[in-house]
Amino acid sequence: MKKTLTSEQCDVIGQIIDRPYLALWADMGAGKTAITLHAVAELLRLGFIRRAIVVAPRAVADSTWRQEAALWPGTSHLRVVTLRGDKSVRREQARTPADVYCIGRDALAVPGLHRGCVASPDLIALAGDAGRAMLIVDEASSIKNSQSARFRALAWFRWGRVLELTGTPAPQGIGDIWSQMYLLDRGAALGKTITAFRQRYMRRKECGFGFEEVPGAAPAVLDAVRHLVLRLEAPPPCDVTYRDVYAQMGDAELEAYRRFKKSMVAEIQGREITAVSAGALVAKLAAWASGGQYCTDADIRETVRPHCRKRDELTRILASERGPHLVFYWFNFSIDDVKSAARAARKSFACFDARHPEIVDAWNAGEIDVMAAHPQSAGMGLNLQRGGHRIIWMTCPWSSELWLQAVARLARRGQAHTVEVTRIIAPGTIDERISHVLGGKIDAQKLILDELKGG
């Protein structure tokens, strides 16, 4: 069936053409990849740009843009090249004549460089004549850290056009916006430096670590950048239901968890577990709730198991529900739990690996019953809706961005079923705190996007 754009999507294409520096804050599933490719095709036809450079999460850079271009009559002629492989292969790919070059955000900077130009040879090769190139930052919230090498690498060049794409521009609040806006206007709206921005809109937290917004900062910041932002809403592509199931630890297991929380030291299966700081304790409590701990003995690299309640609950769910399941994990030891649960439920298993994009095709073809995936690698930009409609979280993230993006891998256009999202919670543990904090961040993100409706 021939694919066509909606009238609203066509209007956005016109805005991209007319506004060289633009942040498109689009709901997930709004079709921002297709919109952008059509805008690129028109800009190339008009001679406004010579090439487009797409910076994206690795899995998205490897497959999504090329596949999307091939789906549309208006973009199927675009020559899309992805830079991947070893150094010599990438060098040849950068020299290959093309309209769109895709590069993983992990390949933007040279590791270890802290001064001057930190851009990688790949990015430098693509950025030749940057004034006639269009930079497209897919999932632009990935450059929210102004100290990151990837941000400094992109900011080194003066691009002829910049388009930023994201559905989650401020997952931790308005402090995430400065670097995104700087890449568009070099600091004209929010200040030339992050320090100037913080002096005006932020203050140090009472604990002395980190910053928080001053009263009234959010609407003031959004008013200041309104001319740089285009808000694109999308109707919900499908219904989404949420439920929590509980993996209850035994009394002795829960008591051991509480002792560790208080003392920051424990012994499990003869191995020492120590939290050296408050931050380390938070991470280890989340791991404990999920059923594992990494040893802190200097000479031992081993995972020990304080309980297996989440694995058992996952086994029960997989055995009782038909259809494929996308299982998001946070700790690597959970991969073994998902694999074990799938085997016990007599279902096929695979673990998503961004280095092997063919696994996306296998999932969408219905060849995988249970796919384990980390939200940082598979949570952004991938089209997984044809492969299933059930999501299970072994461990919820603190980040609203990772949560929303991960759920949107199935809850997007083309999904034929209600998406069912299940969280496995260990009662009496940090899982409950994470769930509460996550809900607040999702609400704050929605308020920011709602502020720019019609902008």
Roles of regions detected by a PLM:
Residues 28-29, 160-174, 182:
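Conserved helicase ATPase motor motifs in RecA-like P-loop NTPase domains
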Residues 1-25:
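Conserved pre-motif I regulatory segment
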Residues 1, 17-18, 30-31, 35-48, ...:
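Conserved Helicase C-terminal RecA-like lobe
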